[in-house]
C-alpha cells in the first residue's frame, strides 16, 4: 500500500520511534481548542535535526504530500490543523537554546524551545525577552514570534516579530537559507540593512518554509516592578468613550510603561478563577479594568516612573473622565509566563477556547468594544475582551476571547458564528487579524488591494509550486 511505502520512507529518515500513523496519535494532532473543524493527518513525524527536516520536505515534494510544521500543537488558531491531511511535523524535540550573546544582545533558539525554558535560562544571566501573553510556560516560544504575537513587553518594544533578528529556514524545496544579517555576518544581531527577506516567512503560517533557528533581541532584566490600575465606569452599551481612548494614547505616549492592558469585566472574573455562569456585574464595578506596568533597575527610578503614571491617572480623574483607581496589589505579583489560557479554556468546561485577535487603532477601540459587546450579547455569552497598547501607543491588540464547551454543539456553533462576526467588527474598525484562520484571511482580502492578493499567490506559487507547505492557509 502507498501508505506503507510512505511510512517506511519516513521511518528511514527519522527512525520508526519518531513516526506514527496510528489513529490515537493522529487524533491528537487533528484539532486544537478552537472551533476550527478537526482534520486527521496521515502521519505524525517528530524531527530532531535540520537535516531530517530537509529530507522530509524533499520527500513531501517528491510524493506530493502536504507537510504542516507544529510545535507540540501548543499554538491556538487552528493554524496547525492539517486541513488536507499529509504529515504533521512536530518540532518540539528540537529544543536547544543555541546561543545567548550578551555582548551584542540576542539569543538563538530552536523551534521547540518553550516559553518557560527561554525565560528561565535568560533569567539566570539577568536578561529577558518579550514573552507571549496567555500561553503556559510549556508552550512553544517560536510560534508566538513568527506569527506576530503579542508579548508582555509590547508596550515598550512592539509586537514579538519586531524582536526577531535573524532566522534559518528550510524552504519548500528542502534548501536551507539564513535570512537577515546572519546571512552575511557571524552574528545574529539585526535583520537589516541587507534585503529583508523575513517577510517571506513571518505571518505565512508555515506555508512558505519551516523555521529551524530564530534570533531574538534580549534585554537586561530590571529588578523592580510597579503596576498602576484604574477602572472605566461607564455602561455596557457605551463602554469606552473617545475621551478615555485619548487618555490611553496620552498615557502610552509618556513612554514610561512596558505594558498597558485592559480587560472587560467578564475577562477579569475569569482571571480571578470564577466559572461559568457568572453573576451579573455589580453596579459598583467598572466596565473595563486597565493597568499600566513599568519596570526599573533601582527603587528610586521605579518610584519616579510610578509617580508620573499615578499623576497622569489623577489628571484624567480630575478632568472628568469616568475613571477611578483600582487595587492591583495581587495582580502585580503575577509573573510571566502566565497560565491565563488554561483558565479561559476551563471557564465553561469542555476545554474549548477560540479567539479572534487584531492590531487595531486605539482610537477605534471605542466603536470596536461596543460592537463586540453586541456580538457577545447576541449569542448569550459574557463579554471577554482583552486590550493592549503596542509601542507607538496609537494602535494595539483588541482581542475577543470565546471560551466554550467542546462537547456542546450549541456552544460550538455559537462561537463559530461569533468568530465570523468578530472579524467583520475588527475590519470595520480598520483592524488587521493576527494568527488569522482562513475564513478571516478571506474577509481581509475581500477588502484589500487585489494586487496584494495576486502578489501573495505569486510568492506562494514561486516558493512552493507543489503546494505542500501547510496548504489551505491564508485563504490562498
Q: Positions of the model-derived regions?
A:
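Activity-critical C-terminal alpha-helical subdomain
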Residues: 435-476
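Glycine-rich N-terminal segment of FAD-binding domains in flavoprotein oxidoreductases
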Residues: 23-26, 30-94
Amino acid at each position: 500500500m502507498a501508505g506503507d511505502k510512505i511510512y517506511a520512507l519516513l521511518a528511514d529518515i527519522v527512525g520508526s520511534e519518531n513516526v506514527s500513523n496510528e489513529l490515537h496519535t493522529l487524533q491528537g494532532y487533528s484539532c486544537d481548542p478552537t472551533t476550527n473543524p478537526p482534520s486527521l493527518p496521515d502521519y505524525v513525524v517528530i524531527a530532531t535535526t535540520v537535516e531530517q527536516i530537509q529530507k522530509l520536505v524533499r520527500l513531501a515534494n517528491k510524493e506530493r504530500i502536504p507537510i504542516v510544521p507544529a510545535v507540540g500543537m501548543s499554538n491556538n488558531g487552528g493554524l496547525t490543523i492539517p486541513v488536507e491531511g499529509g504529515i504533521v511535523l512536530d518540532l518540539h524535540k528540537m529544543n536547544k537554546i543555541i546561543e545567548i550573546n550578551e555582548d551584542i544582545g540576542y539569543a538563538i533558539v530552536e523551534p521547540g524551545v518553550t516559553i518557560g525554558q527561554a525565560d528561565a535560562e535568560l533569567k539566570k544571566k539577568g536578561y529577558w525577552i518579550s514573552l507571549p501573553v496567555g500561553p503556559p510556560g510549556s508552550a512553544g516560544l517560536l510560534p508566538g514570534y513568527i506569527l506576530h504575537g503579542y508579548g508582555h513587553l509590547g508596550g515598550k518594544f512592539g509586537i514579538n516579530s519586531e524582536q526577531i533578528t535573524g532566522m534559518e529556514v528550510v524552504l519548500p524545496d528542502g534548501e536551507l537559507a539564513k535570512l537577515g544579517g546572519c546571512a552575511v555576518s557571524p552574528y545574529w544581531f539585526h535583520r537589516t540593512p541587507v534585503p529583508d527577506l523575513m517577510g517571506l516567512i513571518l505571518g505565512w503560517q508555515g506555508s512558505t518554509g519551516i523555521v529551524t533557528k530564530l534570533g531574538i533581541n534580549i534585554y537586561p532584566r530590571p529588578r523592580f516592578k510597579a503596576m498602576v490600575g484604574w477602572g472605566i465606569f461607564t455602561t455596557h452599551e457605551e463602554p469606552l468613550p473617545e475621551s478615555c481612548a485619548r487618555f490611553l494614547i496620552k498615557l502610552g505616549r509618556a513612554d514610561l510603561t512596558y505594558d498597558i492592558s485592559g480587560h472587560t469585566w467578564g475577562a477579569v472574573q475569569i482571571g480571578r478563577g470564577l466559572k461559568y455562569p457568572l453573576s451579573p456585574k455589580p453596579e459598583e464595578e467598572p466596565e473595563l479594568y486597565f493597568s499600566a506596568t513599568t519596570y526599573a533597575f533601582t527603587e528610586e527610578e521605579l518610584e519616579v516612573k510610578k509617580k508620573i503614571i499615578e499623576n497622569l491617572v489623577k489628571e484624567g480623574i480630575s478632568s472628568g473622565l469616568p475613571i477611578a483607581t483600582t487595587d492591583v496589589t495581587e495582580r502585580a505579583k503575577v509573573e510571566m509566563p502566565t497560565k491565563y489560557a488554561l483558565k479561559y479554556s476551563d471557564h465553561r468546561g469542555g476545554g474549548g477556547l477560540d479567539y479572534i485577535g487584531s492590531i487595531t487603532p486605539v482610537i477605534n477601540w471605542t466603536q470596536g468594544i461596543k460592537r463586540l459587546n453586541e456580538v457577545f450579547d447576541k449569542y448569550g455569552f459574557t463579554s471577554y475582551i482583552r486590550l493592549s497598547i503596542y509601542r507607538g501607543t496609537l494602535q494595539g491588540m483588541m482581542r475577543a476571547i470565546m471560551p466554550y464547551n467542546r462537547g456542546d454543539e450549541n456552544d460550538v456553533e455559537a462561537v463559530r458564528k461569533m468568530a465570523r462576526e468578530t472579524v467583520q467588527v475588527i475590519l470595520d474598525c480598520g483592524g488587521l487579524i493576527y494568527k488569522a484562520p482562513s475564513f478571516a484571511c478571506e474577509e481581509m482580502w475581500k477588502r484589500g488591494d487585489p494586487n496584494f492578493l495576486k502578489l501573495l499567490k505569486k510568492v506562494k506559487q514561486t516558493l512552493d509550486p507543489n503546494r505542500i507547505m501547510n496548504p489551505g492557509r491564508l485563504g490562498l
